[in-house]
Amino acid sequence: MNLHRIAFLSASMAAIGLVGAALAAEPPVLKAGLWEVTRTSTQQPDQKHLTTMCLDDSVQAEMREFGMGVAKEMCSQSDRRLEGNRMTITATCKLGPTTMKTQSVMVFNGNTSYHTEGTATYDPPFMNMAESKSTIDGKWTGPCKPGQQPGDITTETGQTLNMKQMMKK
């Protein structure tokens, strides 16, 4: 699996709190339907990136299983603690020759919204980045749109990708 696809899938799974799912602490199952996810990062602090995701329980379960496989394959350390509505995730993973250390804190508002703040360091730099910080906000907006399949992600450019299909490759 190439590094760009792993980075995209990891970012997508992180957006809904599913990375590192091999651990005992489980986040709430998010409400099925259409989710709007807004991400900002230190690389582009003045830009917000908006995607929508059509989620159901089966997509979340498959993403957790995929996340476990990626974590086992790429991470030497991962830890997830759930305290009330707050989940803290730390991990040390390899991206090719680069060691990535991450820490994310997610705060859930029931199963209909969440806020995440994350930091990652890269040694040596990954794609010219030594450090990145991001903020992700997700909220349930209603049922998936007609014609959407569970797992569909629509990017801000209008491109639709299906997470289930990407995880099978």
Which role fits each region the language model picked out?
Residues 1-12:
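Bacterial N-terminal signal peptides that target proteins for export
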Residues 14-16:
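Low-complexity, intrinsically disordered segments with a bias for serine/threonine
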Residues 18-24:
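Sec/Tat signal peptide C-region and signal peptidase I cleavage site
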